[in-house]
């Protein structure tokens, strides 16, 4: 379950930000997670609650913003939305696609005190 490792990294990032920006508590975390990032959101929520215990983010609200997956279609030469990596191009039916959006995870913002 790599979601626990993601939560550990998130905790470290928040602790570093707290030292650099002089805050002591995080009350809300907004994460943007791409459809192709390979993150199970429910497992991430569970891991977040466990990993944040005893930290500056204990009890913080986790808000997940799900980003659409997109890919470049080499057959019709454009970026198209995809529900899964295995879907054909919704415009031309082509299968020569390379994901170019919705592949990552980003901390959008933190609500702090």
From Swiss-Prot:
InterPro entries: HypA/HybF. Zn(2+) binds at residues 73, 76, 89, 92. Pfam families: HypA (PF01155). Keywords: Metal-binding, Nickel, Zinc. Ni(2+) binds at residue 2. One of its GO terms (biological process) is protein modification process. One of its GO terms (molecular function) is zinc ion binding. PANTHER family: HYDROGENASE MATURATION FACTOR HYPA. Involved in the maturation of [NiFe] hydrogenases. Required for nickel insertion into the metal center of the hydrogenase. Belongs to the HypA/HybF family. NCBIfam families: hypA. This is Hydrogenase maturation factor HypA. The gene is hypA.
């Amino acid at each position: 379950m790599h979601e626990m490792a993601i939560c550990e990294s998130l905790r470290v990032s928040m602790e570093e930000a707290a030292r650099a920006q002089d805050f002591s508590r995080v009350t809300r975390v907004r994460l943007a997670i791409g459809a192709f990032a390979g993150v199970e959101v429910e497992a991430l929520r569970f891991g977040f609650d466990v990993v944040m215990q005893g930290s500056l983010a204990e009890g913080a609200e986790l808000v997940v913003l799900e980003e659409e997956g997109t890919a470049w279609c080499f057959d019709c030469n454009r970026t198209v939305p995809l529900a899964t990596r295995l879907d054909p191009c919704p415009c031309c039916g082509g299968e020569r696609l390379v994901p170019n959006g919705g592949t990552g995870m980003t901390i959008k913002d933190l609500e702090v005190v």
